[in-house]
């Protein structure tokens, strides 16, 4: 490699495309790819994707899809039997990050029960003798599910396997997703001293056992349930061992620490545990919650909180349960503000109703205000938009009780306090959002006030509704034009009733029959009320007319006072306006007029009747003397002699008259321009 050349390291596909964790389509594609590849080890980026998907999908998929938080275990396997090969708690905690699902869709929860059965058949179809396969001359590890099957099957005798197959047939009809009791309640035997010694011995024995290199331990959340015909001592040891495993596995994997699998053999045990649960509810309930680490906040927000459901029974439970509930909230991380605003918490309605009843009985308004202030300070402040739109249970009932019980002054004070405590919303939201009780308040104000004060009260209401902040006059004017004024429609309806017809008249056609009396003329169409108001305003005169002159005698009269306004004109633009093509036309016009006058002066004596008579007399009596100049100019060499050429021209043609010569001189036909 050249010294200046750096090794080319391509960005991992998972880092370049972070949406991989949020796309179910990629899960389906990876499932198809795993089917094409066959059995083989998981790629590192796929394992990391499974880890990241556990954090992302936990709160989004809900309780109905929890195969991500609850790892996949083959059907018919007992958790106690699998725990024998899984190692100690330390190793279990380190290796629980690697899921045993053979493809990504199992971690995403995209595979249903049929797909799970198909995967098990595919895994069990491989003979157990094939502990490993050789690919390209090297030893390649098997898939995790197959390795777990081989590891668990190696320590069993054929009798146990046969019993397992029968257990599979029994458990196929079992409800897989019944809501679980806590693991403390499922395994009450952990509290006994004999079981603690058995747990210590079993943990020491399992921690020393080593795992095979390619194996990946499977985790479970189901609580162990044994048959009633087994020995009591074996049942206790195995139950304590299973409880130990379940207490370790959910904490390390970050899943729900409650079982999701209900077994048919536990029906009798649960009946016995209910009595123990009722007696020790105050002590046992906060135990698993306080000991378990903090779960994901999105899952917590969607789970049913047992402490919230039990708050309705606070008086019956006593002080011990209150102490237990006080210890629970610090371990629960607060969810986001958006989830708190939208997620329904069981017990909210009952709590608010109880608070309202206690407040009505005791009439302690100050205590209620202090409680509201504490609640508002404890809960994180949500967005203004969410607070204005999200419905909070108890709003309508509280406002109705306040209106019925308190006086008007108390209402004003309480509204001022609530407006001071709550963050001010935008003017747009306050103008458009409906606040319960507005209509009733406005109707009462209109009934109480007199008719002469209606306009003032409506204007005040319009300002209060449209302008929460008095520092914005532009917004006030804008919202006053668009806001709803409760008295406007009633005024227009009354005026329309007085007018005669509230609705526009239909289109009418008149047919005139000759010889009959024509129908009476229709009433002229009347404009709507708003247009009539608009026309009334400009009709009002702006100034009073002169009282001396009557309206009918008005004529156009000029004022005696004349005002002269001087127009300032610059010399440059005025001179430029004179220039143009019309200047040359004006010069030509003047020259032509001058020449016409000159020709008229010369030709006027020739056009008199006396001059014309003389000219005709000359033409009738031509002179007999020949004109030598004209005969010399005629050509004689080229053309033979003819009688026409020898004949002398007449005097009129040969000798021009004086008048024609004078006219030619006067016209100046030489071609020169004047």
From Swiss-Prot:
Residues 206-221, 246-256 have a biased composition (Polar residues). It comes from the Eukaryota. Residues 162-172, 348-373, 395-415, 439-458, 490-501 have a biased composition (Acidic residues). Residues 337-510 are annotated as: Interaction with SMAD7. The modification Phosphoserine is found at residue 143. Residues 65-504, 534-554, 625-674 are annotated as: Disordered. Residues 337-510 are annotated as: 4 X 34 AA approximate repeats. Induction: Specifically produced in response to stress: in absence of stress, some upstream open reading frame (uORF) of this transcript is translated, thereby preventing its translation. By methyl methanesulfonate and ionizing irradiation. By IL24/interleukin-24 in melanoma cells; which induces apoptosis. By viral infection including enterovirus 71/EV71 or HIV-1. It is found in: Endoplasmic reticulum membrane; Mitochondrion outer membrane. Residues 1-21, 40-674 are cytoplasmic. Pfam families: PP1c_bdg (PF10488). Interacts with PPP1CA. Interacts with EIF2S1. Interacts with PCNA. Interacts with LYN and KMT2A/MLL1. Interacts with PPP1R1A and SMARCB1. Interacts with SMAD7. Interacts with BAG1. Interacts with NOX4. Belongs to the PPP1R15 family. This is Protein phosphatase 1 regulatory subunit 15A. It comes from Homo sapiens (Human).
């Amino acid at each position: 490699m050249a010294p200046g050349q750096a090794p080319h390291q391509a960005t991992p596909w998972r880092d370049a495309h972070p949406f991989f964790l949020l796309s179910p389509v990629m899960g389906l594609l990876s499932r198809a790819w795993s089917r094409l590849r066959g059995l083989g080890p998981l790629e590192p980026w796929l394992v990391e994707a499974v880890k990241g998907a556990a954090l992302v999908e936990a709160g989004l998929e809900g309780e109905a899809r929890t195969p991500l938080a609850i790892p996949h275990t083959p059907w018919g396997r007992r958790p106690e039997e699998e725990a024998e090969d899984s190692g100690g708690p330390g190793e279990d905690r380190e290796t629980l990050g690697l899921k045993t699902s053979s493809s990504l869709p199992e971690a995403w929860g995209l595979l249903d029960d049929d797909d799970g059965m198909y995967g098990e058949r595919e895994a069990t179809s491989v003979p157990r003798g094939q502990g490993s396969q050789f690919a390209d001359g090297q030893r390649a590890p098997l898939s995790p599910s197959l390795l777990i099957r081989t590891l668990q099957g190696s320590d069993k005798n054929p009798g146990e396997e046969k019993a397992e197959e029968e257990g599979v047939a029994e458990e196929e009809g079992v409800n897989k997703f019944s809501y679980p009791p806590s693991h403390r309640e499922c395994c009450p035997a952990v509290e006994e001293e004999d079981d603690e010694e058995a747990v210590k011995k079993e943990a020491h024995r399992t921690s020393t056992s080593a795992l095979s290199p390619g194996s990946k331990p499977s985790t479970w959340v189901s609580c162990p349930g044994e048959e009633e015909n087994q020995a009591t001592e074996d049942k206790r040891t195995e139950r304590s061992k299973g409880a130990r495993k379940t207490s370790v596995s959910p904490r390390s994997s970050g899943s729900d620490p409650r079982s999701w699998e209900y077994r048919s053999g536990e029906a009798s045990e649960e009946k016995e545990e209910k009595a123990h649960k009722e007696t020790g509810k105050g002590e046992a309930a906060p135990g698993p919650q306080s000991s378990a680490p903090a779960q994901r906040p999105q899952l917590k927000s969607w789970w049913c909180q047992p402490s919230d459901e039990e708050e309705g029974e606070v008086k019956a439970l006593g002080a011990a349960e209150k102490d237990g509930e006080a210890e629970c909230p610090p371990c629960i991380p607060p969810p986001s503000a958006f989830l708190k605003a939208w997620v329904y918490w069981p017990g909210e309605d009952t709590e608010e109703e109880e608070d309202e009843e206690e407040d009505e009985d005791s009439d302690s308004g100050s205590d209620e205000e202090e409680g509201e202030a504490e609640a508002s300070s404890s809960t994180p402040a949500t967005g203004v938009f969410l607070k204005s739109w999200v419905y909070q249970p108890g709003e309508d009932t509280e406002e109705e009780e306040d209106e019925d019980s308190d006086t008007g002054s108390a209402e004003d004070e309480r509204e001022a306090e609530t407006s001071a405590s709550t963050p001010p919303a935008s003017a747009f939201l306050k103008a458009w959002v409906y606040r319960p009780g507005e209509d009733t308040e406005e109707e009462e104000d209109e009934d109480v006030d007199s008719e002469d004060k209606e306009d003032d009260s409506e204007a005040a209401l319009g300002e209060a509704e449209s302008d929460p902040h008095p520092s914005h006059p532009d917004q006030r004017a804008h919202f006053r034009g668009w806001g709803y004024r409760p008295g406007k429609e009633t005024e227009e309806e009354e005026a329309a009733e007085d007018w005669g017809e509230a609705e526009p008249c239909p289109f009418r056609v008149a047919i005139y029959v000759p010889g009959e009396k024509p129908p009476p003329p229709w009433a002229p169409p009347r404009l709507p009320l708003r247009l009539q108001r608009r026309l009334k305003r400009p009709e009002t005169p702006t100034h009073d007319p002169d009282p001396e002159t009557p309206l009918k005698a008005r004529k156009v009269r000029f004022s005696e006072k004349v005002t002269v306004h001087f127009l300032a004109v610059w010399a440059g633009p005025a001179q430029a306006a004179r220039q143009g093509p019309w200047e040359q036309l004006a010069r030509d016009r003047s020259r032509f007029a001058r020449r016409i006058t000159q020709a008229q002066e010369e030709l006027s004596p020739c056009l008199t009747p006396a001059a014309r008579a003389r000219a005709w007399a000359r033409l009738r009596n031509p002179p007999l003397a020949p004109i030598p100049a004209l005969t010399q100019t005629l050509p004689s060499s080229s053309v033979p002699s003819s009688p026409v050429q020898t004949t002398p021209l007449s005097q009129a043609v040969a000798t021009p008259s004086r008048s024609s010569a004078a006219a030619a001189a006067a016209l100046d036909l030489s071609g020169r321009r004047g």
